[in-house]
Amino acid sequence: MKVLFTFGGIPHYLNAMLNRLQAKGVEITVFSPKKGNTTIGKGVKMVEGGTYKHLTTPEKKMFYGKSAFPALPEIIAEEKPDIVVVGWPYFLQVFFQPALRKAMKSCNAKLVIREIPFQTPPYGKIKEYFKANPMHDEGMRLLSKGIGFYLRQWITARIRKYCYAQAAGTLNYSTAAYDILPSYGVKKEQIHVTYNSTDTEA
């Protein structure tokens, strides 16, 4: 089995998991940004290299305001993986980039979404979620306010729902996924909790 992962960077726990999967006979290919990244938090130490194939590709901020790998359709056409694993915000490309859907369909690749569910509002409960879990920037200024913010969140929720409908499964950092993802139409058997663990059976 050949699995292609996209990451903004590779922290130690992901590196250990990828090495373990490679040792078990899974052919792992990882793509990460050619120059730095915009999706990994400050202070998170990155790992360079492993036993798996690690390549870089240009990352670009797209018209919808999030980072993406524009060359991902060409990468998939060349690598021909059985499974493509993408996390936030890269899985938004499934919605915004028809060429990506076409490339995956042409090689029968299954989509798996890596999610941080405790940062995802339940579908249809955006206002309630952000009232209970306010969003702040690094200067602790409140971001979750105003019509513009809630409109963006509503649109994002609908795009998430579309992307989840294309996925064969989800990998999640937290058991909160069992409470949140079904609201987007994800079946319980498609929800897999990995935590930040090197234990691939977790």
Q: Each PLM stretch: what is its role?
A:
Residues 110, 119-162:
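Nucleotide-sugar donor phosphate/pyrophosphate-binding loop at the beta->alpha transition
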Residues 11-15, 38, 83-107, 111-129:
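An aromatic- and histidine-rich active-site surface loop
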Residues 57-102, 106, 153-162:
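An amphipathic, basic-hydrophobic alpha-helix
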Residues 6, 31-33, 112-115, 173, ...:
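Generic beta-sheet signal
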Residues 149-161, 165-202:
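Donor nucleotide-sugar binding/catalytic pocket of nucleotide-sugar-dependent glycosyltransferases
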Residues 1-56, 79, 107:
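N-terminal subdomain of nucleotide-sugar transferases
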Residues 3, 28, 111, 188-191:
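Hydrophobic anchor at the start of a short beta-strand
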